[in-house]
Amino acid sequence: FLLPRNSDEARAIKPLINYHFAGNLPVYAPSTADTGVNDPALNRDLAGLRILARPGRLQPETVPGAEASATPPGALYDLGADALALARRWWRMSSGTANASYGGLTGRVETGASGTLYRELRLAEFDRGVLREL
C-alpha cells in the first residue's frame, strides 16, 4: 500500500518502488493520489498504481450529468448530484426493501437491511498516464 497525502507524493514514491525492484507488486493508494485529470505527461510516474475511483472520474462521457466531473472539483459536484438523487429516491430505498440500489456519479449506492447506505467505487489503474477501470 502507498499512502500519499496528495498526487505529488504519489508521483515521487511510485518510481522509487519500481527502482527498488518492486515494480511487479501491486501498489494501491487512496484516491488522493489522483489529480482528477487524465494527463499522460503528468501521470506517467503513476503507471501501475491502483486506486478506487468514482464512475464520473473514469468515464465522464458515459455517466449522465458528469460533464463537470472531468475537473478536480467534479468530485464535489458528483456528491451533490447523488445527494439530490438519493433524497428523491429515499422513500423508495428506505421502504424496507433490502439492497435497493442507485447507480450514481460517486458509485453504486445500496441500502442494507438496517437502512444504512453503502457506496461501492470502481478499482482503476494508471496505464500510460491515464486512469483505466480494471
Question: What name fits each language-model region?
Answer:
Residues F1-L134:
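Extracytosolic ligand-binding ectodomains
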